[in-house]
């Protein structure tokens, strides 16, 4: 192949004809696991620095960016619940873990002179602003990165669902789910070498086939509000900007997409 990387454009996504950005307001969902890199637990400062640089590139392109960050690199409520902990208590601990990640990312961004605000669904005024929808939108309009912490503030809801909820609330045009995989497959590619990777999917197909994109509540929220979802590998440098330009860097789920 001569080492040539061939990028194609996704047919069901609007592409800016002048090569500019296809979206102006984006909700980026970062999994907690993405922040720990190759570590088994916690936060890898080098990975966080790389993510911050990508976010800076997005901001410099004039795109408004809000972020929902998970907490699975520190604590997973579902696993703790399965081990016997009260589910609501476990979920609240997980929400606190997301705030730790949000503050870490905020620090990395501010060291690059990127104005950033952390808004949390659980009040902790000493370290973050409370989540108020109008305030979040105003921060975005002023060119600040907005990081949402503490999930939705309610147990039994995932941070994926929070991402869909916040995207609808702030009128984001798309949800980017940045993970450690390069898209959505019909089976686990780690165990099935013949697993098929999808380029585009419909919400209905994702729900009917129970594909592991986001949880069903998040998918339904995006479907009801016609918010497309892009799933891509955060580990590939430049993928966030490429996704905003409409390049096929992963799997796109949308109302007008075909299963391909």
UniProtKB/Swiss-Prot annotation:
Binding site for ATP: 29-32, 72, 76, 179, 185, 188
Pathway membership, UniProt: Pyrimidine metabolism; CTP biosynthesis via de novo pathway; UDP from UMP (UMPK route): step 1/1
Single biological process term from Gene Ontology: 'de novo' CTP biosynthetic process
UniProt-recorded name of the protein: Uridylate kinase
Localization (cell): Cytoplasm
Region named Involved in allosteric activation by GTP: 37-42
Gene responsible for this protein: pyrH
Protein residues bound to UMP: 71, 91, 152-159
Record InterPro entries: AceGlu_kinase-like_sf, Asp/Glu/Uridylate_kinase, Uridylate_kinase, Uridylate_kinase_bac
Reaction(s) this enzyme catalyzes, per UniProt: UMP + ATP = UDP + ADP
GO CC annotation terms, alphabetical: cytoplasm
Protein EC: 2.7.4.22
Pfam family, one: AA_kinase
Intrachain S-S bonds: none
